[in-house]
Design a protein with these regions (language model features):
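Non-catalytic accessory/interaction domains
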Residues: 1-198
Length: 198
């Protein structure tokens, strides 16, 4: 593993094997569990191996790898497309906390695009990535659902509304129209996304 300080200091190389034979060593997640406060940049081969089993990593490692890849891309030290590929590879069934952060990030990245064809393409892509997660949690709360699902739902609906997702837009307009005659039909937790999406 090559360790390269961000302050421009000398790089060092170390073999991290955890007692395994070098011939059978596979790429491990550096900073497993996110215990350290630093970013990790993998070479292309190591990143490809991690990305290939990304859906099987623990939630903390998925979160850490996503955050590392995003931070390096935003700093110009790696391609932002690597972050987008990882986000697209995140299963819809992944931890709601991990998905909530990715939905917020995708909504934030939208602001980097000027109105036009590239923004429209990005929004369509983001909608394709986030829609299966919304299909899992649904538009409405279920009895006994975890609080993380409720928070994820609101974040997804806001992000998808911003992206111009047609299903979210249609549902927002329907709920907005119903609320015109009976405001109690619009629950406090849905007002924001309905008003934005309508």
């Amino acid at each position: 593993m090559r360790i390269e300080p961000l302050n421009g200091g000398p790089a060092t190389e170390r073999l991290v094997s955890r007692g395994r034979q070098q011939e059978t060593w596979e790429t491990s997640v550096v900073n497993a569990g996110g215990a350290g406060y630093y970013r990790v940049s993998y070479d292309d081969a190591a990143f490809a191996r991690l990305a290939g089993r990304f859906d099987r990593l623990p939630a903390a490692d998925q979160f850490g790898l996503l955050k590392d890849t995003l931070a390096l891309g935003m700093a110009g030290r790696g391609p932002i497309s690597a972050y987008l590929r990882l986000t697209a590879a995140l299963p819809a069934s992944a931890d709601p906390i991990v998905w909530r952060e990715q939905a917020r990030t995708l909504a934030g990245l939208d602001g980097f695009y000027a109105p036009g064809a590239k923004r429209a393409a990005y929004r369509a892509w983001a909608s394709d990535v986030l829609s299966p997660v919304l299909a899992r949690v649904g538009f409405d709360a279920r009895d006994g659902e975890p609080a993380a699902d409720a928070l994820l739902r609101e974040t997804l609906l806001l992000a998808l509304g911003q992206a111009g997702d047609p299903k979210v837009g249609a549902e927002a307009r329907r709920r907005f129209a119903e609320a015109q005659t009976d405001l109690s039909r619009l629950a406090p937790g849905e007002r924001r996304w309905v008003l934005i999406g309508a």
